Amino acid sequence: INLDPIQSVPLPNWSLKYTGLSSLKAFKNVFNRFSIAHAYRASYTLTNFQTNLDFDPQNPFQRDEAGNVIPERLYSNINLVEQFNPLVRLDVEFKNSLKILAELKRDRALSLSLDNSLLTESSGNEYVIGMGYRIKDLRIRTNLNGRRTTLSGDLNLKADMSYRRNITVLRNLEYNNNQVTAGQTLLSIKFTADYNLSRNLTTLFFYDHNFSKFEVSTAFPQTSIRSGFTLRYNFGN
């Protein structure tokens, strides 16, 4: 087992996406798109290290006055970050223009301080589900300036909901003491509806609801709500 913190081989990262089910006849009759995805990202860093002048190459197992082995190098901080972004993701679109997205994400960050024997561990889990639907050639009758006009365009509806919980734990390796220092639970609900009034003009309705509850008792829960309409004009052709 290699105990050297300086790794000679980098940690692997990968990203996988499978769309082969879309080629099956049973899926072609129901779905326009059917994909499954998975990805992993990691980083490993040493922020500071130096040669130990007390180390004797002729006696590598020499101990100090406290009975600890004198190391060849002194390390201050070691960091490891891992992300499953996503752990699994399902993205499908039906023949009737209905879209469904389901996603699970996980991440973890470890920071080891050898100066004071503290390990800071942050971890998070996130669940995402989304739906979308397009109503093609929706006709709306209007009466502007006394003239009756019929608008025709696509109405795009989209709704997303995500739930995330992250927590930070401070672990004292000398006294075997663990303490929650930070963390929160996040709930987000978003809804949008856009309609093409003309070739260049689009109107958008949005609703954004966010709720957060903190893990520590010194912080209060927070809720924010944003909603409104947006007009977007495209000056291009």
Please name every model-derived segment.
Residues 1-237:
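Exposed, low-structure sequence patches enriched in small/polar residues
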